Curated annotation (Swiss-Prot):
The keyword Mitochondrion does not apply. This is Large-conductance mechanosensitive channel. Channel that opens in response to stretch forces in the membrane lipid bilayer. May participate in the regulation of osmotic pressure changes within the cell. PANTHER family: LARGE-CONDUCTANCE MECHANOSENSITIVE CHANNEL (PTHR30266:SF2), MECHANOSENSITIVE CHANNEL MSCL (PTHR30266). The chain crosses the membrane at residues 16-36, 83-103. It comes from Methylibium petroleiphilum (strain ATCC BAA-1232 / LMG 22953 / PM1). One of its GO terms (molecular function) is mechanosensitive monoatomic ion channel activity.
Length: 137
């Protein structure tokens, strides 16, 4: 088998194509969920907590004056910028919850497929059972 025919066989298999479609749809879906979190949910969270913007929370490690914006504090020296981590962690928690709700809804809407009937036993198994039953008599 030539290299190209092997590659063609590999690339045309259903799993590879399914994976490619999943990656493309996942990328598009990620943008939708990012928009839901960033444009719809985070403004509500910010409003509930008095307009907090966690991204500017930091601890100055080089003796910066308190109250500087994060960008200026970084110019003045090293900072422990924990606020951005809080924002990303909160976004992740909201994102995970939204995805959980969506998957739960999708699973609820899926129709339960009836279980496949059990496969009949192989011929050798049937023969062995007949021999066993004959020996018991």
């Amino acid at each position: 088998m030539s290299f190209f025919s092997e590659f063609k066989e590999f690339a045309v298999k259903g799993n590879v194509i399914d994976l490619a479609v999943g990656v493309i749809i996942g990328g598009a879906f990620g943008k939708i969920v990012d928009s839901i979190v960033g444009d719809l949910i985070m403004p509500i969270v910010s409003k509930l907590f008095g307009g907090l913007d966690f991204s500017n929370y930091y601890v100055g490690l080089a003796g910066q004056a308190a109250g500087l914006p994060l960008a200026e504090a970084k110019k003045a020296g090293a900072v422990f910028a924990y606020g951005n981590f809080i924002t990303v962690a909160l976004n992740f928690a909201i994102l995970a919850f939204i995805i959980f709700l969506m998957i739960k809804q999708i699973n609820r809407l899926k129709k339960d497929e009836p279980a496949a009937p059990p496969a009949p036993p192989a011929e050798d198994i049937v023969l062995l059972r007949e021999i066993r039953d004959a020996l018991k008599k």
